[in-house]
Amino acid sequence: VSVNLPEMYFNGEEWYSRMMELIDGADEYILLSTFLGSSSPTLEPLFNLLEQKAKSGVKVYLIIDGTSNLDMTETRFVMTPLGYLRDSGVNLLIYSPMSFTHIVNPSSLIVRDHRKMMIIDGSVAAIGGMNINYISMGAGEKCQRDSMYVFSSVELSNLFIDEFVQIWNEGSIKKMDKDEFKKESTEKGEYKAWLFNRNVFKSQVSLSGMFGSLINDSTSSIFLCPYLPTIDSNMAKSLRNAVERGVDTEIWCSTDSRGYAAKGG
């Protein structure tokens, strides 16, 4: 797809504030997907707003992973499960819940939905690594460090809608029609972007293969900022080749000056 440069957020509180603005501005629908989702005293305004939007006629769909209630971060001390949102008209799907049927089929327990994305009215698309929970957005200076990116793009929103509706329809008896949410796109962004989606059961491609291909095609610069800087032999070879052909290559490995990561948070 073609996109322009996104808004970038590296602070949970700042993203929380921007997320509230985007949700408050929704007129037609809000599609939200997260890995760990739960409320807390600091996040109550967000979930209150989702309830208000649903009551006002805005379609609100929320997908959270089935492990959300087993959150082992600092969130566990203040969390409130989100099942109550259904009473206000919010459409809530718990992806692969921790149930007896999954226990007798253990392979299904390891497949989690780790994506975090949001689509507003088919024109705003957000993606990144922040969960919708206390430790990602509501813990002040103790917030985990991650990032979110907001694109004003109908074209990218349509791709996200495809993914969201597929996940929803696989897990819910209340089906969504993606054509009800998509919009026609005539925009042409300044940059090319790719959405890489890997299904652990169906996909024959790998993340390392994707990164290797991008690195091999680079001509001027590469910047990597991984959370866990582990690469396989093919990626290492691609990076060496890039350096040898004169590509400016930087890898930043994150450290936490607060000592937070070392405490297991």
Language-model-detected regions and their locations in the chain:
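Charged, low-complexity intrinsically disordered terminal segments
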Residues: 1-265
